């Protein structure tokens, strides 16, 4: 099968390595990139220029987008998508001028449609939080193909999932077809994994970041690379690279170690400790911007409005405990957190307070799409979530449509905890997950080791086998 890897960030090296491994297994790999560095690495790995689609700012400026806009309208009608929705999900493109964002989307659509059609792409693999990825999902599916979104399994284990859409809702079925078909070994693994969660163990990437970010040689190196090279040079051709303005004001990832220390006294004044004997709803803020918020809960990206609407729904005598994401301190400024703290009934809890202790004491744990609701379900505690993702499959997790429904959920009869059903559901997720990691090499260099690359290729190969077995044709022309 012909497959395409889409990437605009640091996973690209992993995709190139996995593509080479899949080529050795008889498949043909193609790439869509936005950075010259990644294009050169794909070429150096032996993939010819015809195998790599490079999307650039210059290409969008030069493109005649009249016909492309008409084609986008046809795709919207055929696939039930909205391009404006995609632009707003895209943390980089939504900060651009509206006319430029639409021009870039039209250019990307035309280039992708031609590339996918020319190479008869049957599977697209990528990170669905940007316009090229979201359009590729729609285009490939429109011609009968598949889309796979690799994400770390949100449990304390070295496994990952291949979801079948932009949402972490349904995995590609490469193991047990239903929870009732899981094996005794998978059930035992699920039991052990649940026990690890209820002992307080976190996901690997969260557990590795339990201390405030350090300002040292590594930080200074990243700062120099970001400000002096990427922001000033790479951003000239790559839409998906922060500029100086966005690094300082919008996507403030580089600023978190500085802000964490610069504002230390303010944090001490803002944050509170839980109060013994107090009834409360626990709401954990998402790391932002991130896929779990931008794509899986796009209607609720305004943190203040979400907290205000939860708070106004709660009865007297029940507090709302709001806890900042511990790795996100410095992304949200003190002014925003101060506004949240001043809302009636709200306590802004110290980010370093143990979330598991709060989960076990809370009347209800709420998140937009966060792992904290999954952890609450592992304890059999009442939970709520505002997105259509896999966490709603656990017995004590309630799907809400809006923040102001939290109060009604709190007063509703509690959902029955069905531990055996939950265990089978977790075993089913494990059965359809894969060993290895898809974390960026900058975070986990072992992701590029041959053994892990082989595991990624194994997982994608299973999806290809599944697609081939279903004999779904991929030669139907797309509505482009």
For the regions a language model picked out, list residue spans one by one.
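Conserved N-terminal ligand/cofactor-binding loop architecture of enzyme catalytic domains
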Residues: 21-112, 152-261
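Conserved nucleotide-sugar donor-interacting segment of glycosyltransferase catalytic cores
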Residues: 110-173
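Short loop/turn segments at strand-loop or loop-helix junctions that form parts
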Residues: 34, 57, 152, 278-290, ...
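Active-site donor-nucleotide binding/catalytic segment of nucleotide-sugar enzymes
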Residues: 275-311, 324-327, 431, 435
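Leloir-type glycosyltransferase catalytic cores
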Residues: 171-225, 396-480
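Nucleotide-activated donor-dependent transferases that construct or modify glycoconjugates
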Residues: 1-10, 35, 125, 285-288
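Catalytic donor nucleotide-activated moiety binding site of glycosyltransferases and closely related
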Residues: 89, 95, 307-350
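A donor-sugar binding/catalytic signature common to diverse glycosyltransferases
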Residues: 124-128, 151, 351-398
